[in-house]
């Protein structure tokens, strides 16, 4: 039985329609032309803990650590200015060509090894795992020389836009509630571009250690005055156009080796309801409860390597399926499994029969070796009105590089033309040279890799190209050998001779 009742619920209207983000496969036509491109051997060398400033007798030494990001900005040639094997491949009036990345291999040299990091004045007080008795709050400096093997990380991010990282930094305070000296400042999660040379999370957290740790001894030397960033996978995965991360490879491993508490005073006391007070013997007042662990990356094996392997991109995690806008590609790498630091000793005096430490000096260096290889597919875009409007909304510089813009009408005004230009009596008539377009990423630091002259159609001449041909099932045509082929007459006579032997 149907009963009528008054409407006691709210009326919800549908949300306003928004423009739809389309996948690149909906407006891009892929051709059957593939190119191989590879870099040379990329080597960097420096001090693993801090940069050495320049002096009058020595050049500056950069900081090169296995716990830094390596962000390669790969420059690609403009396919619209390329000498193509098929001139009828596209119509320059209505089409444009772009590169699509379908294969990548990041090569790593140098042996596997563990590089230690540490601090000669590390802020550790008690061993809180095997503590025998509480010692009370110490007032003297008991910092000690401590080294750790940091968290093990292997990472590779592929995209056509710079990667995004996150870390904890000092937040802004309200004007009516200032922070007194000695109080904990407010924190905020900061998102920023990951640049080449930025420090990774080594197991002590992703934060601005230079701004948030005044003791300068709570973490190892290589990060005590740095900002450790962690890739913002959530933000890059939610990228509207999917340019920051086509896909990524990641392997992290860590466990806690030692457990300590900190030496300095505690800013926030434990509430009395949380414990029963001690009766002396070093238990009143109680010790610091600011605990910290030293990380360890554990064992390193070749079975767990993500580098020196080819990877094929069939479907990206975002809307950009490997299209390299602005003819550039960003490769972000981290590999702590090859973190061995080279120790070098030199003699300051003649070597004596007995060992004298003052006669020698010790130095430490770290080197890295990379190689980048790619397989690119030539793709075509038909520039309809909808596609051009979509690309302009995504990135206006794409159409500017394709020479699309407003055409100014011819000038109808009368212009001046001097006869004698190069003399002191006439005003200078030299035109101001046009300024180059500013690079929107010039303020960031990347490792530039120029591949504009390293493209090749002969895929079977390169290791990654042969792997790609095997992957897609294309067989190479055998080349004619040096042996001269047999003539038809000799082959017919030999076959007839064989038939005669059979008749006998």
UniProtKB/Swiss-Prot annotation:
Biased composition (Low complexity): 486-496
Primary gene name: L1
Function statement: Forms an icosahedral capsid with a T=7 symmetry and a 50 nm diameter. The capsid is composed of 72 pentamers linked to each other by disulfide bonds and associated with L2 proteins. Binds to heparan sulfate proteoglycans on cell surface of basal layer keratinocytes to provide initial virion attachment. This binding mediates a conformational change in the virus capsid that facilitates efficient infection. The virion enters the host cell via endocytosis. During virus trafficking, L1 protein dissociates from the viral DNA and the genomic DNA is released to the host nucleus.
Region Disordered, residue ranges: 476-504
Family: Belongs to the papillomaviridae L1 protein family.
SUPFAM superfamilies: Group I dsDNA viruses (SSF88648)
Localization per Swiss-Prot or TrEMBL: Virion; Host nucleus
GO cellular component: host cell nucleus; T=7 icosahedral viral capsid
Gene Ontology MF term list: structural molecule activity
InterPro entries: Capsid_L1_Papillomavir (IPR002210), Capsid_L1_sf_Papillomavir (IPR036973), dsDNA_vir_gr_I_capsid (IPR011222)
Protein known as: Major capsid protein L1
Assembly mode: Self-assembles into homopentamers. The capsid has an icosahedral symmetry and consists of 72 capsomers, with each capsomer being a pentamer of L1. Interacts with the minor capsid protein L2; this interaction is necessary for viral genome encapsidation. Interacts with protein E2; this interaction enhances E2-dependent replication and transcription activation.
Species assigned in the record: Human papillomavirus 51
Keyword Disulfide bond: yes
Source domain of life: Viruses
Alphabetized Pfam families for the sequence: Late_protein_L1
UniProt keyword DNA damage present: no
UniProt record, GO biological process: endocytosis involved in viral entry into host cell; virion attachment to host cell
